[in-house]
Design a protein with these regions (language model features):
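Soluble catalytic regions of large protease machineries
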Residues: 2-149
């Protein structure tokens, strides 16, 4: 993900942190390092990269993979919304939304074996939900504070 400047990067990472929290993924988070350009600023525990375990049923394994996929989608969308907070005005998201969808659609097919309708529905629900979340003044305040530190 390319950022325009340091402020843009800070808001983007703040958005991803909020996305992780919304999807209750704090237990999967290892660290956030604003200076770690090489590894994408956010590191996860090995459990995030879970790819199956013979001791876990296939259904449980699929649900874990789906949860991580949904959280990743949420992080990307939250990044988008949070990066637009400093502008303080409504933003058109159509182009960015298409680009994110294209990326996550391929991943959803590959990792979760979801079909196009399932991916589209989940993506739109996530987008709509996060749009509401980032309209909340309390969330916006948290995002501003996180991005400033």
């Amino acid at each position: 993900m390319k950022y325009n400047d340091e402020e843009d990067k800070c808001y983007g990472i703040a958005g991803m942190a909020i996305g992780i929290s919304i999807w209750n993924g704090e237990d999967l988070l290892y660290q956030i390092d604003i200076d770690d350009d090489e590894h994408g600023y956010i590191s996860f525990t090995p459990d995030y990269y879970f790819s199956g375990n013979p001791a876990v049923s296939p259904v449980e394994s699929w649900h874990a993979t789906l949860k991580h996929y949904q959280m990743t989608v949420g992080m990307l969308i939250a990044n988008l919304f949070c990066r637009n907070l400093p502008a303080g005005k409504p933003t058109q998201y159509a182009d960015a939304k298409k680009a994110i969808f294209s990326t996550v659609a391929d991943e959803g097919k590959r990792t979760c074996q979801l079909d196009d309708d399932e991916i589209r529905s989940m993506f739109q629900e996530t987008f709509n939900y996060l749009e509401q979340v980032f309209r909340n003044p309390s969330v916006r305040k948290i995002a501003h504070e996180f991005a400033q530190h």
